[in-house]
């Protein structure tokens, strides 16, 4: 059984990557971990005006993210109706890369599938890309799904690496599996 991590920020792009994963592995048993990473600095105080005095901002943020992931899982189960697929929601309140690394280690993740918008020019230099950072800083293979990409047949695949990385058989077998 494959173990796949699906990071999401609930954007259209990340949901597209999740749907791509469902299609790509429709015939294989998989455990899918859907991860959302939250940071307090991501929120503006106006967003939290409705928080009651007994609730903490932290709990409110985590609960909202858990509810959103639960909704995604419900939609996936209904849309794909696949008994081979199992889902678990994970919400973390941490640094994005640290969270990805912790989850991949804890659950022995075989592959990370995530969306990418492909930041260009000055935007890439200043902000970078979450997907690019995951590729650079995580040992687990990453399948980056471009914005709007749908699964048809794979006729092109980019294998990005640097000259310092030595790949093991397990990492390369994921690429072989994807290529069929």
Identify the meaning behind each predicted range.
Residues 53-67:
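A short acidic, glycine-rich active-site loop
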Residues 1, 108-110, 154:
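Local beta-strand N-terminus motif with an aromatic residue
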Residues 27, 100-150:
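Gly/Ser-rich helix-loop-strand patches that form or flank binding pockets
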Residues 33-35, 88-92, 143:
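General small-molecule cofactor/ligand-binding pocket signal
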Residues 1-55, 156-180:
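Small/aliphatic-rich secondary-structure junction motif
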């Amino acid at each position: 059984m494959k173990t796949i991590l699906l990071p999401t920020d609930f954007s259209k792009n990340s949901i597209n990557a999740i749907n791509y994963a469902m299609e790509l592995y429709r015939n294989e048993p998989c455990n899918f971990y859907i991860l959302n990473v939250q940071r307090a600095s991501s929120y503006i105080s106006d967003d939290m005006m409705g928080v009651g005095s007994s609730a903490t901002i932290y709990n409110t943020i985590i609960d909202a993210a858990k509810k959103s992931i639960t909704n995604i899982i419900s939609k996936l189960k209904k849309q794909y109706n696949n008994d081979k697929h199992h889902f678990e929601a994970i919400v973390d309140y941490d640094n994005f890369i640290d969270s990805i690394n912790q989850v991949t280690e804890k659950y022995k993740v075989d592959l990370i599938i995530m969306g990418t918008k492909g930041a260009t020019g000055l935007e890439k230099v200043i902000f970078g890309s979450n997907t690019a950072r995951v590729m650079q800083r995580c040992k687990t293979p990453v399948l980056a799904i471009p914005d709007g990409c749908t699964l048809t047949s794979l006729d092109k695949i980019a294998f990005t690496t640097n000259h310092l990385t030595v790949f093991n058989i397990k990492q390369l077998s994921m690429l072989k599996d994807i290529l069929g």
